[in-house]
Amino acid sequence: MGIFERYLSVWVGFSILLGVALGLWQPAAFQAIAALEVAHVNVVVAVFIWVMIYPMMVQIDFSAIKDVGKNPKGLLLTIVINWLIKPFTMASLGWLFFTVFFADFVDPASAQEYIAGMILLGVAPCTAMVFVWSQLTKGDPNYTLVQVSVNDIIMIFAFAPITALLLGVTDIVVPWQTLLTSVGLYVLFPLVAGVVTRKYLNKNSGANSDANSHTSSDQSSDQSSHASSNENSHASNAEASLTNFLATLKPWSVIGLLATVVLLFGFQAQTIISEPETIVLIAIPLMVQTYGIFIIAYLAAKWLKLPHNIAGPASLIGTSNFFELAVAVAISLFGLHSGAALATVVGVLVEVPVMLSLVAIINRTQHWFK
């Protein structure tokens, strides 16, 4: 484990401080970067997230995806958490905190907008960053891909009606461009790149294996034994080639995460300084929701006797959010400077530190699933 992985929480904390400092020092530069958007998806952030996702996509073996159906409980858990529990607990917590606990600190109109923003986060399960969290918990990359894909399909049909139900708004317009752009950037493109890379590594390792086999075939008369040896050699070379390639990528994956944190906090530096009390008030129920959903999902995974490499990602998909979609809908419904938009932004700021703490919990409780 390298210095970045060993002290990841420290590096993230430093990146948060650096992002805020740079955002205050060079606000124009961050505004220019923030303006580089396609369908409310920031291109620069997308590149860094792509750098984080790509290593896991290289690990995906399509020949093994068919085996995912042998353990459907992980998929079922993810679906139940994301669509039957999470949106409604988020709405309940938003109402409880902002109409009861924080009623003396927030005016009713602002409270309703904050609740709306929290609901939008609750109805949008993660598409991109879950690949990063899965990789950090040594999750099954094939299973994670299927989990994310199934949730993306459900989201297309369920996001608008659940959002309308909880917000009490009937004319919810799903920003299809944002949704499809995000799925393309964070799932399809890196997946294709990963598949092409894996095939290239296998082809090269196969060529090396064939070269070695021709050298030894002149000295061997047992053809069947030679064929078996050649197969094993090819598999061994392919695995070694993949392992070496992933080891080369690993530092870049962590650097991508830290760069993303710097950008996200740099974008919101002015808001963090100008409205710290509001941000704290919004962050509290969001953190309660995140840890609460994780506890429910993780304990359910243990009860279902899921293997650790499925239980971890299954518990993290629901706790992480599709913030691009939530921000886009908040802006379209309530406006750029609304309380709802602010709440979705706070969700972005809270997510990385909280999710890293959950990653640490999953890694330290691996023995629960043995």
Give the positions of each predicted feature.
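Alpha-helical transmembrane segments of multi-pass small-molecule/ion transporters
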Residues: 1-58, 63-319, 323-370
